[in-house]
Amino acid sequence: MVLCFPLLLLLLVLWGPVCLLHAWPKHLTRAHWFEIQHIQPSPLQCNRAMSGINNYTQHCKHQNTFLHDSFQNVAAVCDLLSIICKNRQHNCHQSSKPVNMTDCRLTSGKYPQCRYSAAGLYKFFIVACDPPQKSDPPYKLVPVHLDSIL
């Protein structure tokens, strides 16, 4: 039993930073955080677009993809057939057509001086969807995670 406590403590210390990378600001719903991170109907330059995300998290996010479409159109993907997500959950949905998107990747800097490169893409995407929370738009399901780009 004495040996278990140090191992548990080590696990918690190592797991803490991983959890922070996937956490969202608690005053936002997961759908609203998804919208902030991934919905950008009109393309913006990556340095500018990413500063909005980084200001919430107080660090330079290493990579982010912006879908150049409306939240309504992306939420409509949630009505399509469910598929298995990367995490083995069954709440993912693939877009029926490709969309324009921008992939932003951190090239240098420390928060708040984060610098990004941009790559324009035209691809399909997969989103994880959940039932909406009270302050979310009134759809049956709303996107909460960008699972992959195809």
Curated annotation (Swiss-Prot):
Instruction: Identify the residue position(s) of the site Critical for catalytic activity.
Output: 61
Signal peptide range equals: 1-23
Question: Binding residues for substrate, per the UniProt record?
Answer: 61-65, 86, 105
One GO BP on record is:
defense response to Gram-positive bacterium
* Annotated glycosylation sites: 55, 100
Site described as Facilitates cleavage of polynucleotide substrates, positions?
59
Q: Where in the chain are disulfide-linked cysteines found?
A: 46-104, 60-114, 78-129, 85-92
Catalytic residues (positions): 38 (proton acceptor), 145 (proton donor)
**SUPFAM superfamilies attached to this UniProt entry:** RNase A-like
Assigned protein family:
Belongs to the pancreatic ribonuclease family.
Q: What is this protein called?
A: Ribonuclease K6
